């Protein structure tokens, strides 16, 4: 039903942006505040955005891919998901951008010297990201085949996030840079 709050957010087309905001700067800033010394009280927005932008985009990709297999049903019921509005071909063409930008946002801090080289372990998500890109390029308009896209996106998000977290956690134990 679209009567509850999630339905209202959907009507306003705010699901993907709210997802990106929640998993982007908001969740990491909360974690950083908890880890900060007592009494600091300052929200580390820049660090939170740097830590959360790539994983937030990967998480938003899961939500985005959850619409491909139900385009006809959504359109028939007046639901205007991004995939319905763009069409499956144009929406599928965005997936390499989601994946590539996720990695760019995670690897740029390494290139700039803000993060240790071990953060490149986020590349563990690359096989799932590549499988998702290949699937959607080939079968974007075949709902029976695209129904697994959300699971591939979830696999990308999980391996990418696990690799990034492990890379950042292992850095003090394995100094490479």
Model-derived regions: residue spans:
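Transmembrane alpha-helical segments that form the membrane-embedded catalytic/substrate-channel core
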Residues: 1-7, 25-30, 53-68, 125-137
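Transmembrane helix-loop-helix
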Residues: 1-6, 44-47, 97-144, 177
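Intramembrane alpha-helical segments
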Residues: 1-40
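Interfacial loop-to-transmembrane junctions
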Residues: 12, 132-162
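Hydrophobic alpha-helical transmembrane segments
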Residues: 17-18, 48-53, 92-96, 119-121, ...
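Small-residue-rich segments of transmembrane alpha-helices in multi-pass membrane proteins
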Residues: 17-32, 84-88, 151-164
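Helix-coil boundary and interhelical linker segments in multi-pass alpha-helical membrane proteins
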Residues: 27-53, 104-118, 165-177
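Solvent-exposed interhelical
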Residues: 56-100
């Amino acid at each position: 039903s679209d009567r509850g709050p999630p339905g209202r957010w959907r009507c306003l087309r705010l699901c993907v942006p709210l997802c990106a905001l929640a998993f982007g700067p908001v969740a990491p800033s909360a974690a950083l505040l908890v880890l900060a010394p007592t009494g600091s009280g300052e929200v580390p927005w820049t660090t939170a955005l740097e830590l959360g932008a790539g994983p937030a985009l990967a998480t938003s990709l899961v939500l985005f891919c959850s619409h491909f297999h139900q385009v006809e049903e959504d359109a028939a019921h007046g639901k205007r998901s991004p995939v319905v509005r763009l069409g499956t071909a144009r929406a599928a063409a965005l997936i390499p951008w989601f994946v590539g930008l996720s990695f760019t946002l995670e690897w740029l801090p390494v290139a700039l010297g803000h993060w240790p080289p071990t953060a490149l372990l986020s590349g563990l998500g690359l096989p799932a990201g590549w499988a998702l890109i290949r699937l959607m390029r080939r079968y974007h308009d075949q709902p029976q085949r695209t129904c697994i896209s959300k699971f591939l996106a979830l696999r990308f998000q999980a391996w990418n996030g696990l690799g990034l977290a492990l890379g950042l956690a292992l850095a003090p134990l394995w100094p490479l840079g």
